């Protein structure tokens, strides 16, 4: 990947000039001037997904200039580098190949002169065999009973992805009950174990190194709980490992035959497609897990092969850069109108902020422009009764992605029609608003005297011109969810490539862990500490006096 400062390109300068022409343009006028705007500013994927980006503060000229930025920063070369196994994560000297995990075409992908696909396929085959034994009941616990509950113990990418997907695909789940434990706060594991029986519980310990503090603390507590009923030799029937550290796995008591490997070129927040997704395969069955991979692979091909003007991840990435760097928008909201998707925003909060929350470029120099945005969101319509007020009438510009399926898995009365009426209404309201004239007319039509309501009119005005993307899926299936996740992954990659940052490391998580490891021994006794700054000393000493 090349090291090109985007602000030094001719395209960036052209975008700055273009912004001066666009900053006061209203979305309503863009529609008024172009009867075909929806058709021109939307694109489909596989006849299963439509992305409508027409309600944005953009014109065809805007997109041309943004695409020129992608060309001048050599985005296509970066895409080829990732797909070909080049070590684009240079700070850790690693390839970035989550695309290999779902490479359903099985074409060779080479890292260090070796095709990785045979190993990928071997782990998938092992996951298939294992999941089928658990689901069928062939696998027995230490008292001869079948497994009924599965507890995934992980954190970050080893938790967020599998949890999000198993929730999003609950309509496809089998009889196994899934539980996810991540927080080192003992409450999380304690509350989970209260409802379980050691005889019928399987634990998946997800840690590449088998040393992650939070995960291993929870894993040891789970083992202690298990050993109140079972024996040490029974651990192997109730614990499996998603790891690469065979020695540590064996020492823990897990049979290495039940260790599922993944590789350095699998980043944590891109790992649900790997052995880390074993909980997904157990929840929805391996066949559906394969469909998830297939949907993601189809989006990979779309991303790699589709021209930029119709390439969904690239379009979304460019529009995001437009708002973040030219309009000064600091956040993006992800708003799924589907209750099963309630963890989707949280998943891509990590996916985006841990990937592109960087302040130095690929040359190690501080940047003079905006990199990753703040990502947040909740399912609709709950968010409408929480934070939409600020999106509609606040002083912050918050570009939003609205996501909804046309067909619900629960055809309950008119629930889905009501849900989707809100989905359509919100993007219309955000784009077009309600003028003072309309507010005054509504009062007049209601028989109100203009003078008597004059004081309230300003509060009922909606300026509009708030940008949104609408992502409409036929329905949420393993295949379509896989494609949707991959689309957002590639959007994040595209933004990082153009903005000249390393997307696939996460050094920002290290300092806090390092300091915590120094503080932990200081909490072992009641002695006052004085080795930190005044605030930290004061907090630690008060904690010691209160505990």
From Swiss-Prot:
List of catalytic residues: 354, 385, 513
Gene3D superfamilies: 1.10.1390.10, Glucose-6-phosphate isomerase like protein, domain 1
Pfam families, alphabetized: PGI (PF00342)
Associated pathway: Carbohydrate biosynthesis; gluconeogenesis; Carbohydrate degradation; glycolysis; D-glyceraldehyde 3-phosphate and glycerone phosphate from D-glucose: step 2/4
Record keywords, A-Z: Cytoplasm, Gluconeogenesis, Glycolysis, Isomerase
Catalytic activity: alpha-D-glucose 6-phosphate = beta-D-fructose 6-phosphate
Enzyme class: isomerase
GO BP: gluconeogenesis; glucose 6-phosphate metabolic process; glycolytic process
Matches recorded under NCBIfam families: PRK00179.1
Job description of the protein: Catalyzes the reversible isomerization of glucose-6-phosphate to fructose-6-phosphate.
Protein known as: Glucose-6-phosphate isomerase
Annotated source species: Erwinia tasmaniensis (strain DSM 17950 / CFBP 7177 / CIP 109463 / NCPPB 4357 / Et1/99)
Name of the gene: pgi
């Amino acid at each position: 990947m090349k090291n090109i400062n985007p602000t030094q390109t001719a395209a960036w300068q052209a975008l700055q000039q273009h912004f001066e022409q666009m900053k006061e343009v209203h979305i309503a006028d863009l529609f008024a001037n172009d009867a075909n705007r929806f058709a021109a500013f939307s694109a489909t994927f596989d006849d299963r997904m439509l992305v409508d980006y027409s309600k944005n503060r953009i014109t065809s000229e805007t997109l041309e200039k943004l695409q020129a930025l992608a060309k001048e920063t050599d985005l296509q070369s970066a895409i080829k580098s990732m797909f070909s196994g080049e070590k684009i994560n240079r700070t850790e000297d690693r390839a970035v190949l989550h695309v290999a995990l779902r490479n359903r075409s099985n074409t060779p992908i080479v890292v260090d002169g070796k095709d990785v696909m045979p190993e990928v396929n071997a782990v998938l085959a092992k996951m298939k065999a294992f999941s089928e034994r658990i689901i069928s009941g062939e696998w027995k616990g230490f008292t001869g009973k079948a497994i009924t509950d599965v507890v995934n113990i992980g954190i970050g990418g080893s938790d967020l992805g599998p949890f999000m997907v198993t929730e999003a695909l609950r309509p496809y789940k089998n009889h196994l009950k899934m539980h996810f434990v991540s927080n080192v706060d003992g409450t999380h594991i304690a509350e989970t174990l209260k409802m379980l029986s050691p005889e019928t519980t399987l634990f998946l310990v997800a840690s590449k190194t088998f040393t992650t503090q939070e995960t291993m603390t929870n894993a040891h507590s789970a083992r202690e709980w298990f050993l109140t009923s079972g024996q040490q030799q029974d651990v192997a029937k109730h614990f499996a490992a998603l790891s690469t550290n065979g020695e540590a796995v064996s020492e823990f008591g897990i049979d290495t035959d039940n260790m599922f490997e993944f590789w350095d070129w699998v980043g944590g927040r891109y790992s649900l497609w790997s052995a880390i997704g074993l909980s997904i395969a157990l929840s929805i069955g391996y066949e559906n897990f394969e469909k998830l991979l297939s949907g993601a692979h189809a989006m990979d091909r779309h991303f790699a092969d589709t021209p930029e003007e119709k390439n969904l991840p690239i379009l979304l990435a460019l529009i995001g850069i437009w708002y973040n760097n030219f309009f000064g928008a600091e956040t993006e909201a992800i708003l799924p109108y589907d209750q099963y998707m309630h963890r989707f925003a949280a998943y891509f909060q990590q996916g985006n902020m841990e990937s592109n929350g960087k302040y130095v470029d690929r040359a190690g120099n501080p940047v003079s422009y905006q990199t990753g945005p703040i990502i947040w969101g909740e399912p609709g319509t709950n968010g409408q009764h929480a934070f939409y007020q600020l999106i509609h009438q606040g002083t912050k510009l918050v570009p939003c992605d609205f996501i909804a399926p046309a067909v619900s898995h629960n055809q309950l009365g008119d629930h889905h029609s009501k849900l989707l009426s809100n989905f359509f209404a919100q993007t219309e309201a955000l784009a077009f608003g309600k003028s003072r004239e309309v507010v005054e007319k509504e009062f007049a039509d209601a028989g109100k005297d203009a003078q008597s309501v004059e004081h309230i009119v300003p509060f009922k005005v909606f300026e509009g011109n708030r940008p949104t993307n609408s992502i409409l899926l036929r329905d949420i299936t393993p295949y379509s969810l896989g494609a949707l996740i991959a689309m957002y992954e590639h959007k994040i990659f595209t933004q990082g490539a153009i903005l000249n940052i390393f997307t696939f490391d996460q050094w920002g998580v290290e300092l806090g862990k390092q300091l915590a490891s120094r503080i932990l021994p200081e909490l072992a006794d009641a002695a006052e500490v004085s080795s930190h700054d005044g605030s930290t000393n004061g907090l630690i000493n008060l904690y010691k006096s209160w505990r």
